[in-house]
Amino acid sequence: MDKKFYITTLGCPKNIADSMSMHHSLLEEGFTLASLPEESDFHFINTCTFIQSATEETIQTILSAAQVKKQNHQKLVVVGCFAERYPDNIHSEIPEVDLFFGTGKYSQAGKILREKFPELSPSQLEFNDSLLERWKLSSKIENYSKPYAYVKVSDGCNRGCSFCIIPSFRGKFVESPLDDILRDTNRAIRAGAKEICLVSQDTVYYGRDSEILLDMVRKVAEIDSLEILRLLYLYPDKKTEKLIRLMGETSKIAPYLESPLQHVSSKILKVMNRTGESSYFKDLFSLAREVKPGLEIRTSFIIGYPGEEPEDVDQILRFIEDTRPEKVNLFSYSPQEGTKGAQLKQTVSEKEKSKRINLIRDSHLEILEEIHESRIGRTYDAIVDGIEDGQVVVRRFQDAPEMDEVVYVDDVSLIPGRIGKVRIDSFYEYDMNGTWV
């Protein structure tokens, strides 16, 4: 009997990479992918608990899935960060969950199911197709049909940012062996990916040594059939400078810098236990644009951290005005139990956090409108992601999948994965309309 699984993934691209690892493990054990959660025998929910809103979304998703389970006689499996952080709560408060496991067992998902449910004998699972053929078949369903894939280069983090709960359940930094990174990259490419996004909690920490990090990136970029290599989550430090210079030397690396600054006030950065200062960040962004023409920048800021005052917010506003990053993500600080930040006196009200976020967002939107205006009539290297509401979704190399702007075009003859050029014709607040040329 063919046993099917479905994976609901919450949170960031790192979770998507973990879901892909779980996906492959289940295929190896003979399971197949269902088109919808209600059609599955095993519904996996890969959870997120980075901030309070993510935790709330996770809980609501699990409860909704529990209702579906009652109607479809399926097993509900909760995995990842929430399961690692709150195992006792899941066990006592959500009895509908049949199985849960934490962040270190994604690649063992298939074997874990067999052990937990002995009735899943080999005779009940289909092994008629080769693993690669099953992967390609399942790639036609859900996330794996996309022309991009995420490959994790490490897990965990050693930075010790005072606002971050991740090390408490992801653990210390552990890098993936280079052979595993190359294997996962080649596997994704064989399944149809044209673009590989390297992800981790802290990509530039890889190898501890700059040359080891650069060598890893070079070797991935050297894979013949890889079209685009995108580097995500680059902590702003000296190793990132060297990585930026490599971007300028390597045509396959996308013209894109994602470096989450979290703040620019030296006072707040110190309380956050992060390094750097506004002038250094400006130099880093300038270097990136200098060595990689056409590069665009994505960064993020945490607003309302304990001790933040209006003048600290003004520093962010001035920084954005001076550096004009194309993509800015803003988080309202929420204290996480078990972090040093949660032990501090919470000095900024939720109302004030919202006010500050709106102020920064409005300021950046004015800049973004000017940036959009400058894009009109220009052509960009781009990749076709898929079709949405009858329009083809195209993404410039300057935009990361699932996070940044897209370009809508009317040419329905375009197929996912095609690479070419798109001309920008008009824009919305964030996304754009264009013509494939």
From Swiss-Prot:
Cofactor note: Binds 2 [4Fe-4S] clusters. One cluster is coordinated with 3 cysteines and an exchangeable S-adenosyl-L-methionine.
GO cellular component terms given for this protein: cytosol
GO biological process, one term: tRNA modification
Keyword Iron-sulfur recorded: yes
Segments crossing the lipid bilayer: none
Domain annotation Radical SAM core: ranges: 143-370
Protein localization: Cytoplasm
EC number: 2.8.4.4
Known role: Catalyzes the methylthiolation of an aspartic acid residue of ribosomal protein uS12.
PANTHER family listed in its UniProt record: RIBOSOMAL PROTEIN S12 METHYLTHIOTRANSFERASE RIMO, RIBOSOMAL PROTEIN US12 METHYLTHIOTRANSFERASE RIMO
Entry protein name: Ribosomal protein uS12 methylthiotransferase RimO
Organism: Leptospira interrogans serogroup Icterohaemorrhagiae serovar Lai (strain 56601)
